């Protein structure tokens, strides 16, 4: 989905992988463009039937790999599920970064930017993937 792996460089539907000159646009503008692109897709009848959290479903993904040689590869991948707010005026919070102010977590009734650092680390894709990889490392003999 959009913005995918290009999230840091996302510059709207015309430049989903970033501007040709490589310049970045401000994050608040990226957030506006992403909400508008989602709203336009939904208004045009985009198929959202496969989205498990409804038509505004979104997730962050973190994958980590520990490579200790050809026969010793360990992978951890985790997600944080949420939804994208309907309008930029619904953005909230000053914590976090990137899309956090528009990434709403229904189970907390907050955006990711409204969570404390401790709350976010407990549920974030990065926190979960890191803890999983630490468990893997702790179980490996002869690192």
Locate the predicted segments by residue.
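Anionic-ligand binding patches
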Residues: 1-143
């Amino acid at each position: 989905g959009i913005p995918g792996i290009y999230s840091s460089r996302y510059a709207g539907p015309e430049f989903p992988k970033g501007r040709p000159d490589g310049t970045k646009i401000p994050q608040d503008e990226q957030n506006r463009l992403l909400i508008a692109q989602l709203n336009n897709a939904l208004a045009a009848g985009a198929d959202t039937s496969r989205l498990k959290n409804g038509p505004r479903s979104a997730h962050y993904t973190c994958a980590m790999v520990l490579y200790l040689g050809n026969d010793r590869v360990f992978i951890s991948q985790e997600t944080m599920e949420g939804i994208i707010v309907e309008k930029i005026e619904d953005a909230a919070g000053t914590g976090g970064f990137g899309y956090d102010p528009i990434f709403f977590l229904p189970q907390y009734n907050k955006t990711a930017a409204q969570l404390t650092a401790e709350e976010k680390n407990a549920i974030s894709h990065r926190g979960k993937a890191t803890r999983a990889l630490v468990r893997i490392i702790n179980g490996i003999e002869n690192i």
